[in-house]
Amino acid sequence: MAYRKRGATVEADINNNDRMQEKDDEKQDQNNRMQLSDKVLSKKEEVVTDSQEEIKIRDEVKKSTKEESKQLLEVLKTKEEHQKEIQYEILQKTIPTFEPKESILKKLEDIKPEQAKKQTKLFRIFEPRQLPIYRANGEKELRNRWYWKLKKDTLPDGDYDVREYFLNLYDQVLTEMPDYLLLKDMAVENKNSRDAGKVVDSETASICDAIFQDEETEGAVRRFIAEMRQRVQADRNVVNYPSILHPIDYAFNEYFLQHQLVEPLNNDIIFNYIPERIRNDVNYILNMDRNLPSTARYIRPNLLQDRLNLHDNFESLWDTITTSNYILARSVVPDLKELVSTEAQIQKMSQDLQLEALTIQSETQFLTGINSQAANDCFKTLIAAMLSQRTMSLDFVTTNYMSLISGMWLLTVVPNDMFIRESLVACQLAIVNTIIYPAFGMQRMHYRNGDPQTPFQIAEQQIRKFSGSGIGWHFVNNNQFRQVVIDGVLNQVLNDNIRNVHVIKQLMQALMQLSRQQFPTMPVDYKRSIQRGILLLSNRLGQLVDLTRLLAYNYETLMACVTMNMQHVQTLTTEKLQLTSVTSLCMLIGNATVIPSPQTLFHYYNVNVNFHSNYNERINDAVAIITAANRLNLYQKKMKAIVEDFLKRLHIFDVARVPDDQMYRLRDRLRLLPVEVRRLDIFNLILMNMDQIERASDKIAQGVIIAYRDMQLERDEMYGYVNIARNLDGFQQINLEELMRTGDYAQITNMLLNNQPVALVGALPFVTDSSVISLIAKLDATVFAQIVKLRKVDTLKPILYKINSDSNDFYLVANYDWVPTSTTKVYKQVPQQFDFRNSMHMLTSNLTFTVYSDLLAFVSADTVEPINAVAFDNMRIMNEL
């Protein structure tokens, strides 16, 4: 095409020179006529002889003919000189360029099974703490007392519901819940032991140290600590470790030990873990060269099929999943090798087309875009799009008949569903109106947009009516995936007539029938161009058969490594495919077989398994959190935050760009799913022990007492002088939750007006301020006025304040005869006192086992050399030499 342009400019220059010469000749003729008339009219006699100018003109004519022949030779030479420019300068514009999104690929490959995390400590909500004892006058005693307090007492500031605290606690438990516990890995030395014994973890050891050093600890307890050590039963592969735990923490850890996810691992399990189709593939040799020990363990991946049906009405989520799957699939599709030399093939095509300097432009376009990069890109795009079920769109030029004829092969081999409808219709319409209808002399097809039938389906009927027989290409209209469930996974399988390449032979018959038609309404050049294009493709029948088998084999081999159902729904965005790159693939495919290496297959399989397993675990977490929120009566809790957190933990989604309607639809689907048993049991454990957890917190009260008359502060051993009530004897009680639910505050108002204190019972947060004066100033405004006047209980925050020897206001009590009072009292139950004997537990686990996360590392795999490349029907993939 480049040499055409240059030739065209040379011809244009020649034409310009001719025009200039013609003008000069006209002027000369006029001058000659004038001179001739003058001579005729003049009476002078002149002798006429040959002028020197005429002799010069003859010489110039001879020279010009020589120059024209030289220019013609130059024009002919440009074809050879500029073939490379044809290939690289102009035509590479039509090559599809794929830019791999490295970040998405890295995110996918970085998803590792979370089972690999190693536990170094037991799970704990509580820890024992030493608290001082206060005398009646507010001074500290020298003795102290041990209480169980919350390890993470994190109630955020602001309007916060205690129920949300428990929801966050549950989320924390789910995050820290171990998949397996091996106590030997976390055991540490007991410093106070007589015989270098070990306790279960470092926190147990530090508690033992603190108790041992406490002066008030009994001698019997010290002696017991000195005896604390592990007990091994080697014959049963069991070890017992002493631990110091709150009874609730013990229940958690005992549950984790009893419900570990690890299972015994042996060679059979590993071999069966490999997809069956790869195990049975004669092109691969799989071998295991060692046995696993009896202590080998693994965690079975969670490969439940998609319970959310993300392909159904989740357009942006589905688009993201298919995009990431497409990028992953492209990275594992093998590169073509030993392709036909591009220059040699273009030269051969030029000879077949009998290209000359003055050949019509439509035939020179046949060579457009043919190069090995485009061929390889097309091969990878087709297989990766089918594996990820990404929709493709076709890009083509109607005047390039060769690319349209190549498109006929593409539509024969790749199911119609893989292309966006509008693009498929446009391509089929171009083929019908450019090749098929002109062959029979039929008028152009005018396709009505939105017609349920495709142009090919309409053409099939019209040609049968027009000519009495079709062109034998009806199979292209029935080219759909077959849905087959293999090993519990829905696979989109190519039809058997594609896999055994019968369709290629039928395609060739149809093309040959088209080339034999007369093209009655078209010029001869048009007919010749179409026939030559068909000839170019039919000359490579053997290679097309091999290419189709190669495409099908690579697709099906990689498909065996897909673990999630291959749902087919058209995607929002599409992968562009140039028909010129399809021409490159058809014309340059050689006879070298390429199949995925075993290492590539294993890598692809592992990444798919890890993503799928993580996906299911995150679904289980989200379902559990939603169920917990409902059970805790958090009706006003925004579920969108839970769904956003779920999507973030899947790594591949840009959560901020997901539309709200899809977020809420996702929430509704998550609500319908059942909770996984382990997560449900854990929540029930928390629910049963909410009272103990509230008691251990310094920020949660069990109620508030309000009155019109001031109530005196009372002495408390744990705090000094405080507005804390330890029991509700003598108070009228109202349930805080019922009050908030009904909104009827008349009962409280009546009681307060009758000077009767009211106790509102229920968990609620309280704030602490050490300045008594500022507290007394705030009290009426913050608590009393809100309940009686505004009647809003949901913002109630009872205020705890204390006056003791640690307080800034202790001097008020020490130096003055002043009795501090308050209109509110905080109802707070006493936390559980630490008792060494009740906190001492023995935990049992396996003495030793080894958890393997990468099962395929034990399998040595190789391809059969030389590659037999046998397809599903025991025929060689590449037969053509």
Curated annotation (Swiss-Prot):
The keyword Ubl conjugation applies. It holds the Pfam family Rota_VP2. GO terms for cellular component: T=2 icosahedral viral capsid; viral inner capsid; viral nucleocapsid. Residues 394-414, 422-442 are annotated as: Hydrophobic. The record marks 220, 224, 228, 840, 842 as: Interaction with the intermediate capsid protein VP6. Residues 19-30 have a biased composition (Basic and acidic residues). The keyword Zinc does not apply. Sumoylated with SUMO1 and SUMO2. Sumoylation of viral proteins seems to have a positive role on viral replication. GO terms for molecular function: RNA binding. Residues 1-80 are annotated as: 5-fold hub. It is found in: Virion. Keywords: Capsid protein, Inner capsid protein, Repeat, RNA-binding, T=2 icosahedral capsid protein, Ubl conjugation, Virion. Disulfide bonds: none annotated. Residues 1-45 are annotated as: Disordered. It comes from the Viruses. Inner capsid protein that self-assembles to form an icosahedral capsid with a T=2 symmetry, which consists of 120 copies of VP2, with channels at each of its five-fold vertices. This capsid constitutes the innermost concentric layer of the viral mature particle. It encapsidates the polymerase VP1, the capping enzyme VP3 and the genomic dsRNA, thereby defining the core. Belongs to the rotavirus VP2 family. The N-terminus binds RNA. It is necessary for encapsidation of VP1 and VP3. The N-termini of 10 VP2 molecules form a cylindrical hub underneath each 5-fold axis of the inner capsid. Homodecamer; each decamer is made up of two conformers of VP2, called VP2A and VP2B. Interacts with a VP1-VP3 complex. Interacts with the intermediate capsid protein VP6. Interacts with NSP5. Interacts (via N-terminus) with NSP2. This is Inner capsid protein VP2. It comes from Rotavirus A (strain RVA/Cow/United Kingdom/UK/1975/G6P7[5]).
